[in-house]
């Protein structure tokens, strides 16, 4: 059983964020609702609206958060000082009270443009940079408690696949199978099912296919990509199954993807660039003659959100560090015919990588 995060955990995270901002030559960090605020203060508003909520973190003074007065009760448990504002007040003037007039701040990537512009009007000398660019490891490197949650989410997703793989596919619609996946995600401990992709036959050539009323048929390749949120952290896995025995070509394409996924996993090590993981997978697929049919990056970070830094993509030279969690999900997509993708979540360790998904990567034959 994972322990809940405490005020001490959030205080340590805010202290670390302030130190990283100072090291980057910044005055502090501005955090708006979303995963950043949940991570740093344990607070998530009931809804994200046009009313500004913003946490200001400085190395030189205690953290403080501006909140709408009507939302103050929900914010009280956060281990920060609160400054509320009422409808009719100048919210940006109130927010400016928490900031240095000529400060340079890392701000949440998800901050609304209207709020950034409002702060700039209130403090014309202030400057803002992307939090991801300025503090790249803040959420990307998970601590032991987070890694425990990530591993549990991965194991739960594995249990979903093992159960769905024993069910009947042929003669059922993609939508029906997707509904089963969503139900199983909850049954295996997720609070929410975030997404379910069931892409059969030619639909498998669309990586982000939305399940349809197409009836799965004998001879189909079926891509199953699904995930949810468990104890606040995300799962995301993909397996491709075949209805009956595959053709020689289908088996060959599948094996290329499997080998590419393994090559990418083998490239995971501290100090390696994120792009090295992408290059490893892409090299295998290109070498087999399918380079133009691998049409997306090899992976994305995952944690409080399903897609977050770091990204395994050409041009991403950021070094891999122990504690980073990300997907490895190469694919080959043949328009009008079929697609194959295999995805695991991997946690970088001191000496390589640890798969958080353990179901077989061999082609599963289903009925």
Where are these regions (language model features)?
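Active-site neighborhoods and metal-handling regions in enzymes and metal-associated proteins
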Residues: 1-367
């Amino acid at each position: 059983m994972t322990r809940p995060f405490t005020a001490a955990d959030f205080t340590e995270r805010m202290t670390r964020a302030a130190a990283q901002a100072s090291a980057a030559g910044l005055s502090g960090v501005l955090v708006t609702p979303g995963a950043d605020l949940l991570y740093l203060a344990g607070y998530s508003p009931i809804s994200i609206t046009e009313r500004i909520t913003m946490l200001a973190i400085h190395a030189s003074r205690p953290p403080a958060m501006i909140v709408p007065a009507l939302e103050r009760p929900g914010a009280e448990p956060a281990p920060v000082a609160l400054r509320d504002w009422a409808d009719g007040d100048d919210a940006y003037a109130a927010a400016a009270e928490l900031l240095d007039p000529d400060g340079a701040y890392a701000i949440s990537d998800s901050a609304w443009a209207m709020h950034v512009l409002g702060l700039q009007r209130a403090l014309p000398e202030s400057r803002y940079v992307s939090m991801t660019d300025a503090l790249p490891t803040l959420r990307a490197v998970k601590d032991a408690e987070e890694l425990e949650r990530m591993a549990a989410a991965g194991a739960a997703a594995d249990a979903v696949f093992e159960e769905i793989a024993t069910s009947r596919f042929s003669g059922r619609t993609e939508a029906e199978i997707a509904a089963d996946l969503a139900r199983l995600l909850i049954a295996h401990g997720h609070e929410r099912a975030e997404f379910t992709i069931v892409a059969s036959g030619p639909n498998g050539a669309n990586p982000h296919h939305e399940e349809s009323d197409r009836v799965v048929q004998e001879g189909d390749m079926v891509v199953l990509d699904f995930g949810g949120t468990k104890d606040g952290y995300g799962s995301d896995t993909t397996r491709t199954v075949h209805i009956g025995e595959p053709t020689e070509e289908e088996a060959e394409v599948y094996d290329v993807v499997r080998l590419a996924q393994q090559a990418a996993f083998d490239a995971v090590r501290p100090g390696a660039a994120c792009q090295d993981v992408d290059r490893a997978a892409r090299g295998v697929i290109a070498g087999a003659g399918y380079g133009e049919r691998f049409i997306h990056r090899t992976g994305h970070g995952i944690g409080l959100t399903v897609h977050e830094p770091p990204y395994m993509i050409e041009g991403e030279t950021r070094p891999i560090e122990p504690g980073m969690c990300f997907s490895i999900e190469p694919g080959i997509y043949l328009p009008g015919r079929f697609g194959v993708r295999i995805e695991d979540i991997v946690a970088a360790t001191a000496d390589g990588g640890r798969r958080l998904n353990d179901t077989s990567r061999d082609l599963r034959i289903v009925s």
